[in-house]
Structures are given as C-alpha cells and as structure tokens.
Amino acid sequence: MVSLSCGKINDTVEPFLILQENFMKLLKKAFAFTFIFMLSVSGLTGYQVNASEEQKHLDILFTHDLHSHLNSFQTIVDGTQQETGGFARLKTLINEHEKENTDTLILDGGDFSMGTLIQTVYDTEAAELRMLGYLGCDVTTLGNHEFDYGSDGLADMLNAAVSSGENLPRMVVCNVDWDAMKKAGFSEGQKQIYEAFQTYGVKDYTVIQKGDVKIAVLGVFGKDSLDCAPTCELLFKDPSEAARETVEEIKKNEDVDMIACVSHSGTWEDEKVSEDEILAKNVPDIDLIVSGHTHTCLLYTSPSPRD
C-alpha cells in the first residue's frame, strides 16, 4: 500500500512545485514505499520513503526555481506579507532535518540562476551552483534560465564552478541530442557547452547511495523550457522518449531501489500539454518527478493512488 499525506512544516512560505503522478508504479519494486508529502520553508520540499519489507528508509528534500535568491525576500502568502527564500534559511532547515536522518537525498529541479543581482556573477563565479553545493544538494539539472547568458555564459559558469574546487552537485540531463549536433557539425557555442559538460561531468543519469537505499536520478529539459530559452543553441530529443531510453538503461545496468527524475518541464491546467504529467504517464517506471519551470503546485486529489 502506498499512502500519501500532506501538511506544512512551516506556515511562512508558499511551497515550490512538486509532482509525483503515478505513485502505484512503486509497487512494481521488490518492496513497497510509503511517501509522506510535506510542504516546508523557503521552497524546500520533502518526502519520506519507507521500504517496509526490507525496512529501508529514505528522506528526499528538494528545491527548484530558486532564481539566484541567495538572500531571503518579502512576499505575500495567504494574504499576509511573509519572508521567504534565502540559502541560509534553507541550510538551517536541512541541518535540522539531518539531525534526524543524515542519509537524506537533496535534489534541485533547475533554474537555480537569474532573478536577483547575484546573477551578474553567474558566468564568472558560478555563485548559485556553488551555493547549491554548500547546501549539500546531491543532484541538479539545467533550466531555461541557465542559458540566459548564452552558450559561452553557461560554459563559463560550469567551468568556473569546477575551478572553485568546491563540492558541487552532480548535474544530469538525458535529452540533449549530441548525436544530431555532431552529425550536423558543432557550432562554436555547442562546442563550448559540450566541452564544459565534459569538464563538469554532466551525465544522462547518476546513481546515489543513501544509507541502504540506492537511487538513480535522471534529468529532463522540457519543450516549453526550450521555447523559453531563445539563446539556447543545443538540440534536444523528445523528453519522454529520452527518459524512457534512459530508464531502460538504468534497469539494464544498475541495481537501484528507485528511479527519480529532476525535470525542468512543468505542469499546466490542460493535461494535454502538462509536460511532467505526460512524462509520468509515458514513463511509469519513474518513481518520483521533481517538476520545475512553471512555478505551479499540482495537487494529488485522487481518493485512490491507483487512479
């Protein structure tokens, strides 16, 4: 039985988006997971995962669309002015949580940059990506705003992050169509990003071990994200097709307990164009989708998780 409960840890902020469309697909695993959905402070959201038969437990915390908000700011939540955001607040919450469970997986769904004056040192200092490292973020992906400074800006940012010598989150995105670009001949910008990806170690997916739970995490860059990135020179495969191929590769080559996806695709009221809902339906072996991009909250309202 997969159960879902919802509640706020802290009433001071509006939560960032989380999507997990198809919880019952978890029952295809060798053991059952129980998810507890919690909305919390400063855009940090969490899951607790229990593998009852094997007595495995995993907490997952995640962010997305942080948009260079290294400092907190004032906004209106439920009709009242509240303080939200800020990496110091995030780090405090993470530290408090890790006192209870040090084996916590921390994910980010992209668009970690562009939105405050911090973005002015994006390409030279990689401040946002390095700060994700300080938070203890395990895996992140690219959003459309990571391309705002063009191909050279993204490449310079990745190289600057590596040059810092600091602990950095792993980065995953599975649907970049490198083969098509190589066949057509790299543009200078494509070449810059390709080389920066190699330097940083960007992969289609990565495998993380937390305690006795092994998790594969893949990344997806959505169609609407590409439409919102006019300076992006990269070519991309269909997100669902690329994710399906990557999941099959994971199932073939990795012995993991669950598969998670950090997706910068988003959800919409119209299910026909709601990209991460489509992804969840098209690739049911993905157990968890962290959905960024649209800054919306998709509520799971079905009385039965089998629906």
Task: Tell what function each PLM region has.
Residues 34-42:
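Bacterial N-terminal signal peptides
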Residues 43-53:
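Sec-dependent signal peptide cleavage junction
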Residues 52-302:
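Acidic, metal/ion-coordinating pockets
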Residues 303-307:
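A short, hydrophobic C-terminal helix/tail in secreted or cell-surface proteins
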